[in-house]
Amino acid sequence: MITTMNEHQKIPIYTNDSSLNIYQNELMNLLAFLKEVHPTFLIDKSLDERISLMATDICNQLSDKVQWNLSKFQVWLNRLLVELQDAHSYIPLESSTLYPFIIRFWEGEFYIHSTIPSQKDTLGKVITHIANQEISFIHKQLSQWVPSENPIKSGISGSYFLNNPSFLEAIGISSSKGMLPMTFKDGSQATFLLEEKPQEMMTFSSVSHQITSPKNVPFHYQIVNDICYFQFNAMIDRLSYQIGCQLMGEKTEENILASLPNFEEFLKTMYAEIAEKQIQTLVIDMRYNGGGNSLLGDILLETLLPEHIAFRAYQSFVRISNYLKETYSYYSTIATGNNQLANTDTLPDIKEWKTRKKSGCRFNGEVIFIQGQNTFSSANYLLTTIKDNRLFPIIGSNTSQRPTCFGDVIPVLLPFTRTKAYISHSHFKRPDSDLDYETTLHPDIFISNSIEEKSKGKDACWDWILSKTL
């Protein structure tokens, strides 16, 4: 998986029918674009008819434009995208009117993450009901309205939309005169009022774990007694940026390049200190890693495995559509039809990857990986490779993504409403194809923290590691 464009590009206008309103035309434009670029239409031949019927039904509902606004329209576009069964392809919702809270999902529970000062007593509280609907019912509804691949992802992504009145209406939650009641696990209740101009919010403050609390950097490490703790938060560095520029046919910007860390230099520094202090245990924490460029995972494995070891790798396929050829100069000369998936093994190597010199550093001690609900995309890709080949033990909780999945998103703009969308153009098959049916990556040892434990600074995974290594 490769992180590509950051700027949203307009999709072509496929439909501009004067008999249709702006939302109807926009819906049909998105449908046509999906059929041109998304690989699932080449894998599931029955999808074309199913999604076309759904689009027709939505289009009929859109005929009364007075009943619709942009936010409600975007909610229904996501309903269409659910049919792709692809957590990478989604549309962020826009709304100027929101309820004054932010909800987050953590290990099966929804809680108040942020709210206005007058509701500060609700911060951190676990929700049991919203407007008399049980949270378990709401969670099930999210999978029908939020692009996802399992209930963990629908909970994570859907929690971002639960302050949006258009989204709440779609999933069957109604409010009276803009008042939304909520009940919490401790038996308390609160009512939130709809606001056009959101006030400044307070955020739930939990106790930070001394070692494992997330740092705002792509990667960092520290030596703790006889353990090297390596927090791997994002698969982005100078090399991945250069590769992205080559794919787009753009020049690298020196100020951006200089601001990014060098992953291989980071590993050299870390391994040098490990050798100096004779550290025998390396813990690699990927619980906060939402992905990036999977090549950083390849670089990491080079330093952890014997040089000539053979293991099963992912099979990666890209749908080289006409749109992709026009947008990415790398694909412009590849002679592959729009209705074919190209195996990436048959494509030419990116110059920066082909010419890189391997660091030559290697760690030969015990390695333990940690995963969690927010391990996603290229991070999930790396850990699935490790799991399917039984390379290293993995502890933690289940991830929010299928190991066999879609990805490599194209950020786009719909032409009439300028709605932003992210659409996948690649398909990834896990090394162990017998497990393609799995909707999450299971750790070897399941260890979970509740929101109550997390708020007190407890980390059950770190406690487990200490119990095994001390």
Show the residue positions of the predicted features.
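Flexible, low-complexity junctional segments that flank or bridge functional domains
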Residues: 2-282, 288-290, 294-317, 325-330, ...
